[in-house]
């Protein structure tokens, strides 16, 4: 470095003009013309995030997925047709916005292309011009899915109930730095082949019965590389450029807060951060870009797979919620466990995610109940606690403290104005708002995209 530059002089030999640090600091605090709106599941998933995203995506310029893989499942109903999404952002339906699969997502290419083909058959068009995939995203291979099944089988009766989509093994490969990224596939194919064979050999050492036809897999992935190439970009700079241009950017969280690997009911969780932190790391965003955080809350609680569930119902009401709510997993096809709304849980996920508003879904499923219970706190070993247990052993032992509210015994399916809801339904919603200190801005009362109440202030 020259003496002139070391002394802070200008490039023409004159003294450099002092920067206005105050103005510079303000620009750092708010460097963009727009902020990101984030939609996150507030419970154990299946809250109806896809419907909310589809609604908000009609006004968005960019819709992003930031984490997870095809273990997630969203269903969006458009003109009576069910569009099922696992890897694709739900915003792909909007032909005016760009859909981004970010660096934090793990991508199973056979699943991605199959998903595109199935949705094309239902009417999805021109997606090639709207879908952008991060060059930094990691790839889920069939071998990861094979390993997922082998690991679950080894656990026997103590299995975690994973989707066996290979998500955990892929994130493990990422963490141990032998994972393979999109950029590897699109680079020197010889180098990609060597990395793939190395991954196969590692798993062969771990699992004696593990078998992969390496040659046929490499032939398949050479074809995938060319199909994928036109879709791949550096999504970090793309998202930042969109914000600098003042575009509306929407982020669709997959899974949900209680499945977050750090804040969920570990180990009965997924392998990514599906809370607000995953949005930042999964897209390369700094905290000051976050604007609205919409927590999607089902009017009752459901869970797929194993793990503690304090408000779970094992009676006819649980069966009624399952039947009326059509509670079968989009990805796993497993019946969802059902229980009462849990405010203690929602306060906890609200602390982690910082919800600025709530979308309450499936209110109509409660229409036939005479009484509705709501969990308001937990008691552990005889003492009322003001925190959410980090230990699943403790969570499995809590006693749930409920309040009971009257049901409304009227259909809400055709209601489109909050004031036209039965008074008891209005009370139920206001009770949730008052407890969480967060406004309910939307209420889902049916399956279709039009079956939603926009709550006006």
Swiss-Prot record:
Pathway where this protein functions:
Purine metabolism; AMP biosynthesis via de novo pathway; AMP from IMP: step 1/2
Where would you find this protein in the cell?
A: Cytoplasm
Residues noted as binding Mg(2+) in the record, renumbered to the chain: 46, 73
What CDD domains is this protein classified in? AdSS
Pfam families reported in the protein's UniProt record: Adenylsucc_synt
Record's cofactor remark: Binds 1 Mg(2+) ion per subunit.
Q: Where does IMP bind?
A: 46-49, 71-74, 163, 177, 255, 270, 334
Alphabetically ordered keywords of this record: Cytoplasm, GTP-binding, Ligase, Magnesium, Metal-binding, Nucleotide-binding, Purine biosynthesis
According to UniProt, the reaction catalysed is: IMP + L-aspartate + GTP = N(6)-(1,2-dicarboxyethyl)-AMP + GDP + phosphate + 2 H(+)
- Which cofactors are reported in the record for this sequence? Mg(2+)
**What are its E.C. numbers?**
6.3.4.4
Which positions in this protein are listed as binding GTP? Answer: 45-51, 73-75, 336, 362-364, 444-446
Is Metal-binding a UniProt keyword of this protein? yes
Per the UniProt entry, the disulfide pairs are none
Decide whether keyword Ribosomal protein is in the record. Answer: no
Protein origin, superkingdom:
Eukaryota
GO CC list = cytoplasm
Q: Name one GO molecular function term.
A: magnesium ion binding
Family of the protein in this entry: Belongs to the adenylosuccinate synthetase family.
- Any idea what job this protein has? Plays an important role in the de novo pathway and in the salvage pathway of purine nucleotide biosynthesis. Catalyzes the first committed step in the biosynthesis of AMP from IMP.
For this protein, the record's NCBIfam families field holds: PRK01117.1 (NF002223), purA (TIGR00184)
**Would you tell me the protein name for this molecule?**
Adenylosuccinate synthetase
Origin organism is: Aedes aegypti (Yellowfever mosquito)
